[in-house]
Regions:
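Flexible "arm" and connector segments at domain edges
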Residues: 1-56, 62-195, 200-262
Length: 262
């Protein structure tokens, strides 16, 4: 089966004698499923299982083709338009490969890519360079993109030391607010803002040391999950409930998990 076969399959599903569920779908409903499938693909990539990755890639592609078919039905565009526009864009944004431009480093490539992208979008001095960053991005990823984009204008710390000092400053402000919250009648809005400031500044630390915060947090969460499940298993093997085990014993099991599974 190839691309044409998938398109024909979707057309059959959407046809008069097709599936009621498929015929009912809209771009908005398919978008929700596409997002879910994308997260499942991310899990598969994390598992490093080629067979699983292959299957999840197929699911993502199917939903992308489904979206294209929905717009093709209305006469807006088809698969050739999507592929053609993307091919032209990639060639245009790689002038050092398909043109006469020369680049000296990966950073040069990124700068040239951004410059071409802004020219394509016809961004003027009256338009914010942040406007093209989707508001629907996950908060951590959006913070990374916004800080990265702002830094390209020269609005940035000189080095990572400046950012880490800012983290310490924001941490101090959060601790001050935590002490204030002990007073009666205080709401948590300011506390949430101070906590957000720390997160945003930590995102900038990640940017300076070339670590994507989304990936780093996902890895840390996965590590915690592995250790916690190890601890749960050990407690279950002893025929006990988590709540019946003392904190000291849990701490010991946690250290054991760190040593045995990392």
């Amino acid at each position: 089966m190839g691309i044409e076969s998938i398109i024909e399959l979707i057309e059959t599903l959407r046809g008069k004698d097709g599936c009621p569920w498929d015929r009912k779908q809209t771009p908005q409903t398919i978008l929700a499923y596409l997002l879910e499938e994308t997260y499942e693909l991310m899990d598969a990539v994390e598992s490093d299982d080629p067979a699983e990755i292959c299957g999840e890639l197929g699911d993502v592609l199917f939903h992308i083709f489904f979206l294209i078919s929905l717009f093709n039905e209305k006469g807006y565009f088809g698969i050739k338009d999507v592929v053609g526009q993307n091919e032209e864009k990639m060639i245009r944004r790689h002038p050092h490969v398909f043109g006469k431009d020369t680049v000296g480093s990966v950073e040069d490539v990124k700068k040239r890519w951004y410059q071409i992208k802004m020219e394509e979008k016809n961004v003027s001095s009256e338009t914010s360079i942040l406007d093209s960053i989707p508001a629907s991005l996950p908060a951590l990823m959006r913070a990374y993109r916004i800080s990265e984009r702002a830094a390209r204008t020269g609005f940035d710390w000189e080095d990572v030391t400046g950012v880490t000092e800012k983290v310490e400053e924001e941490w101090s402000e959060l601790k001050t607010e935590l002490r204030r919250q002990k007073e009666p009648g205080k709401d948590h809005r300011r506390l949430a803002l101070e906590f957000g400031d720390i997160l945003f500044t930590l995102v900038n630390v990640a940017r300076f040391i070339n670590i994507h915060p989304e990936t780093a947090l996902r890895d840390a969460t996965n590590k915690f999950e592995r250790r916690f499940k190890h601890m749960e298993k050990r407690i279950a093997e002893s025929k006990r409930d988590m709540r019946s085990v003392s904190q000291n014993e849990k701490d010991a099991m946690w250290e054991e998990a760190k040593d045995s599974i990392g």
